[in-house]
Amino acid sequence: MNYNQVNNTCFFNTLYIQYVEDIGRNEYFYYDLKYPVFYNVKNGYFQVSESILKNLNNTISSSIYDFKQGIFEEEQQINTQNPDGSKTKVNYRVYSNYDLTFNKNQVISLILSLTALDNNNPQYNDLHNYNIDLLTGNQLLLKDIFRPNVDYLKLVSDFVNFKINQNPTFYYPDASVDIPEDQSFYLTDQGIVIYFGLDEISPAANDIPKFLMEFSNFESYINPRFYCNAKNINFNRMRANNFQQFNRVYY
């Protein structure tokens, strides 16, 4: 593949994505959990290993229900410490939401938002990412999004610190980042979104800090497999299969 050109063989993954919503309540606990379940499409141009899809679905489900169970146990502990009703009971609510932000070239990028409130006061706000190579089932790391031999840690660190310095009042004084290999991120058609946890580099009231590295501005550094846009989407089965074969050799 010519590294000086945008990928011209982008194609959508042929997956069926089932929307699931689980709602329930008891006296002091309410939950509304939304999440996807992935399935192969019959006669699609490629079939993801069933074990890969099963592992992905189980991982997403476990993240949600483990979070819900932890908050439920907290509610039980708080409210059972007050059996005589001398103190006001605490109402807990748990939510999950998701976005499938990239679904092309046998790669998916999904973000899962987990939030919990007590008496309408936010207590937890976690953002999970699932960047999966559907050929191998492996979780993609930040290094995989860049071309070989790119000093991606310095590149991303410099970009994020530049953005922080553009708006310093939004962040903690002297906030500076040194991006690790396991940095949290997700993919979109537009670029790579680097993000941090609540209260990590900015006060929690500012929500989760995110930084978009647009592919168009970093084209010479980006692995073309991930650089897709409306102008290079391909629906031709033959070309998609050719890309799949090339991809297996290259990676």
Where in this protein do the model-derived segments appear?
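Compositionally biased intrinsically disordered regions enriched in Thr/Gly
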Residues: 1-251
